[in-house]
Amino acid sequence: RGDNYFAAGGDMRGSNCGVFVGAASMDYGNRNMDDLNVIDPYSATGNTLSIASNRVSYLFDLRGPSMSVDTACSSSLVALHQAVKALQSGEADVALAGGVNLLLHPFGFVSFSKASMLSPRGRCRAFDATGDGYVRSEGGAFVLLKPLDRALADGDTIHAVIAGSGVNSVGHSPGGISVPGAAAQASLLRSVYARAGIDPQSLAYLEAHGTGTAVGDPIEARALIDVVSGERPADRPLLIGSVKTNIGHLETASGMAGLLKAVMCLKHRAVPRSLHFVTPNPGIDFDGGRLRVVDRYMSLDAGDAPLTVGVNSFGFGGTNAHVVLTEAPAANEASTAVPEPIHAQLSPLVLTARSANALGALAGRYLAALDNGGDWQALAAAA
């Protein structure tokens, strides 16, 4: 992680560090371009997507490849794949990869609502029979990537290892450009795991794209059954889940959100519950296809073998991305623990509400949670 690196005094200025940013939203520009009087010399450099990556390279004097990637919802995972390729080819020695999504203009909400993409009930119900769309959310996340041998030699904290990654396209879809394709998704999975030399049936967990749409979820499930889960024994189904049920759909940054969840699953050897899964989608053969949605906290166990997890991410223009992760080397664990910051016990618990009465009621609920043994740090982080 970049914050760990900089906290340890790392300085990458002048280095061959690449920057790869998944970004697509033009909301800020849309808000400001209606009035010609507000356009100034900074309007171009402040609103073009290329600057999202280029400005990071400029501010920190990073000399490697610098590019912004727009493949809609798969942008950040495609950006990570490009970063991996740059490291493998030697174009970069180190790489920052991630994505960002901000919701600042009603355009996307109106358009996606008219396309029946957004949930009228405000819930991402991935793989559930009542799934009726997704909830837009915003955020950003980045990871610092290095070749494994160099990271070990430098004594860096290694959170996980990227064993393989890949990107492809649905191509022409009879249902329209925004309709996913199970055949293309399955083809991508086969190629990624073949190149990585990993049996997909050995996956401990797969973080699905899982938006909770009536069309997308069954299509993704068919691809998973075809390649990853269909040949498993009945007592060892593939565990799947979607972080979108917990934090909403970060769109261009959603692949990175899924990747970070997958990394934490490896580190803790457990998977948190995917929310709002009550009735399995009847369009998915969960039992016959050996799929199980993680509807409660579950431990992961691969026996003596390292845990392996996968991450799916798809764009509504047809660009698919997949990444497979394995656990960090055991030798790294004892020597690379990051010390807890001195201020860790001083994190503020920030509350906000629509009125003073609502704020008081909210504060009361947090007090009750603390009285019942709730962890202050966890509550402060989630508030």
Describe the predicted segments one by one.
Residues R1-H343, S347-P348, A353, N357, ...:
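Condensing-enzyme catalytic core of the thiolase-fold
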Residues R365-A369:
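Conserved short hydrophobic interaction patches
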